Amino acid sequence: MPSVPSGPLRVALPIAADHPSYPGHFPGQPILPGVVLLAELMEAMRRDAATAAWLGEAPQLTQAKFITAVRPGQALEAEWTLPGGSGGRARFEVRLLAADGQVIGVAASGQIQAEGAP
């Protein structure tokens, strides 16, 4: 198993402005559904070998808070921190970015528990 990083991991979280979930959620005022945001986050987390090994096959979302709506074309970054050892919960945050890369808000935050963790 790869070693658990000691600090936060941060990645761009690109979601296409023409993502198929936008037109129906909501017509005329499209926002990204929370379930899509979480699915994209999980895919990003699984691309990191250490995070994927820590998560296991069936991690549990133990807490999620949706703070700011994500509009089509909005730039996002995801950051998460894994706890030391095999148990515990990873904390995550998905941030909204300005064109210059500066954080302008938080779209979502929460915790994910590794498979089999108490």
Predicted regions and their residues:
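HotDog/MaoC-like acyl-thioester-processing domains
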Residues: V70-P72, T81-P118
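Hydrophobic beta-strand-centered segment that forms part of the acyl-chain substrate-binding groove
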Residues: M42-L82, R89
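Generic structural signal for residues positioned in beta-strands
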Residues: R10, Q63, A108-S109
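Compact, glycine-rich, soluble single-domain proteins
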Residues: G24-P33, L37-R46
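Hydrophobic residues in beta-strands and at strand termini
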Residues: L13-I15, F66, I112-A114
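Short amphipathic beta-strand and strand-loop transition segments with alternating hydrophobic
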Residues: M1-V4, E79-P83
